[in-house]
Amino acid sequence: MPIITLPDGSKREFVNPVSTLDVAADIGPGLAKACIAGRVNGELKDACDLISTDSDLSIITAKDQEGVEILRHSCAHLLGHAVKQMWPEAKMAIGPVIDNGFYYDIDLDHKLTAEDIEALEKRMMDLAKTNYDVVKRVVSWHEARDAFSERGEVYKIAILDENISKDATPALYHHEEYTDMCRGPHVPNMRFCQNFKLMSVAGAYWRGNSDNKMLQRVYGTAWADKKALKTHLTRLEEAAKRDHRKIGKQLDLYHMQEEAPGMVFWHNDGWSLFLELEKFIRQKLGQYTYQEVKGPLMMDRALWERSGHWDKYSDAMFTTNSENREYAIKPMNCPGHVQIFNQGLKSYRDLPLRMAEFGCCHRNEPSGSLHGLMRVRGFTQDDAHIFCTDDQVQKEVSDCIQMVYDTYATFGFENIVVKLSTRPEKRIGDDDMWDRAEEALKQALIANEIEFEILPGEGAFYGPKIEFTLHDCLDRAWQCGTVQLDYALPSRLGATYVAEDNTRQTPVMIHRAILGSLERFLGILIEEYAGKFPTWLAPMQVVVMNITDKQADYVQDVVKIFKEQGIRASFDLRNEKIGFKIREHTLRRVPYLLVVGDQEMENKEVAVRTRDGIDLGKMSIEDFAKKIHKDISSRSLKLLEE
């Protein structure tokens, strides 16, 4: 006689074991129809799984994020169902849930085309609209293997042989004649899986190993209702328009090429963006009293072994040999900063010591994961390390948090998700050390009135950390900033200071990054602004255009005045119609377009318009310069008169 306790505290008693679906039906037919799965005593279960003991139960519907992820997983099975109907010879590998959707890896000799994907999507919809029940059957390991052997599903057999114990009881999910294997849960009926779209097909190695066979990975997205699906697809369309790779080419910002995969060739305008970003962060460093240093690009393997990075990162490090010594190009800056700290005796009076670097780092990322500026092999970190005492940790972390928020606000990012990762099972130090460290981070967040989520056990073995994830205009999440306590590296590399009692003590090291990678952050900004950078950041801030040759000298004089005042300005004296010039520089996203005709020249004025076509009228050169200087110095996100 199980007693079921619901989230509101109410209880329901049943004579026999019941399923989540039974409980939902007991509450009401509407909830039964909406029920996708259940969370029983904190564990997700299929709606059909029986509950035989007193339990806490939350009924999962498509209104819950968990429900959406379950229906996405079931859409992957639906995809498998459709594939096997259209190409019975296909072998199904794995079909997991990913952000906003799902995929399935398929072994199929026939190369899937855009037309195939369209036909596959239609077959999926035809199947889903029959509203068939998904039948779950828990079997022995041997029964599962026999079932897939009969079907020739070699990848399912491999999963059973290599990943599942023979004592296990796998769950098989039957979609009419199609059978798949999964830990679940899945939807009870395919009426939940009718708001989806197949997005693309790509190659993927089995098990992610290039020594294995290349499979075809079909990606899809799925949502709880048509409105959510349409919203997502609209966002994807907008994201495609804002793709930094496309805009980077249009605006001549940078390029990449096969001879240097994952390395950026910055062009003049792109490098201007980079330098402005660096200049901005450098000013922040001054405000928060950092030293700026520069460490070597390459160091002996022995140092990386002492730091512990060789054991964990050697596969991702570029190495070279010279004079019988092995060197590694740095994937991070921290060991180099400890070497600088170690030069000369340090006293407690020298702490906190804040050390920052725009460090050029390299990591040997897999070629298949490289993606424009977002995922590169060579990148610049706005990295800093703070050496301090235990008592100073909370204040230093609080300052880091303020620096993060001040910086993100300048770029218009206000939706920041903060997560605090706490002690993992395997860790250095005693519980008292971790209690103090975690409490210092918590109090720093609370003091700054920051809402945060705690991720138990997700910290590094050497200390807890705070992660800052910003959300852009399309509500995409970008994890950029981090504040990480480190109680291990200073000790490993012999960093000490003389304490007030004249004993040698090891400092706490705080790793902190604001932007993370400058290259990646610029990619985010290109997409956030769709190439329409704020004036202070724009590679070219003003372009001055003449209507006829008669104004050419005056236009050049105006540009000279602007340049002397530190405004990035250029002129366009081409013998083209003024409308053509305006359109061209509008496409280049230049913030201010200044037109000069006879009247403007005679009155020592310029006619001002913005790249968005707003006519600001005529102004004297001095008035416009004064206004744009205010625009630039304030780092305004808006143009004049917006």
Swiss-Prot record:
GO BP annotation list: threonyl-tRNA aminoacylation
Family matches, as PROSITE patterns: AA_TRNA_LIGASE_II, TGS
GO MF annotations in UniProt: ATP binding; metal ion binding; threonine-tRNA ligase activity; tRNA binding
Enzyme Commission number(s): 6.1.1.3
Any one of the GO CC terms: cytosol
Domain of life: Bacteria
All residue ranges annotated as the TGS domain in the record: 1-61
Gene3D superfamilies linked to this entry: 3.10.20.30, 3.30.54.20, Anticodon-binding domain, Bira Bifunctional Protein, Domain 2, Threonyl-trna Synthetase, Chain A, domain 2
Cofactors: Zn(2+)
InterPro entries: aa-tRNA-synt_IIb, aa-tRNA-synth_II, aa-tRNA-synth_II/BPL/LPL, Anticodon-bd, Anticodon-bd_dom_sf, Beta-grasp_dom_sf, TGS, TGS-like
Annotated transmembrane regions: none
Quaternary assembly: Homodimer.
NCBIfam families in alphabetical order: thrS
Main function: Catalyzes the attachment of threonine to tRNA(Thr) in a two-step reaction: L-threonine is first activated by ATP to form Thr-AMP and then transferred to the acceptor end of tRNA(Thr). Also edits incorrectly charged L-seryl-tRNA(Thr).
Designated name of the protein: Threonine--tRNA ligase
Gene, per the UniProt record: thrS
